[in-house]
Amino acid sequence: MTPTKAKDGKTHTDGRASIEKLKRGFAYKLFYQLGVWTLNSSLNDYYLAVSYTVRDRMQQLFINTMRTFQQKDSKIVSYMSAEFLMGPHLHNNLINLGIYDQIAQAAEEAGLDLQQIIDHEEEPGLGNGG
């Protein structure tokens, strides 16, 4: 079964980045996915909640792309190079999705500092000990 756009109010992947949906997304991920309550949440908990909310939006776009590839019987050519490190992903993904301002406003209205959350992300390593 191919997933479709969520309309259940939980994953918020219908393409519109409303402030209220994003705030509900943060709260949902915090409570149901991470199992923490806002009163005892750490910066890492908030980072994960925001990241999972963003990931859900990216996942829907990925699914839509893969569906298009299947329908058109497309061919894919891939090139993998581990010589270039992209750095932290959250900030880049917010910009690429075009939802940075909406996430920033939703975070502010939820009493969170988006820049502090973005800065919390660790630099991903290459994995080769270097």
Model regions and ranges:
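A conserved ligand/cofactor-binding region detector
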Residues: 1-130
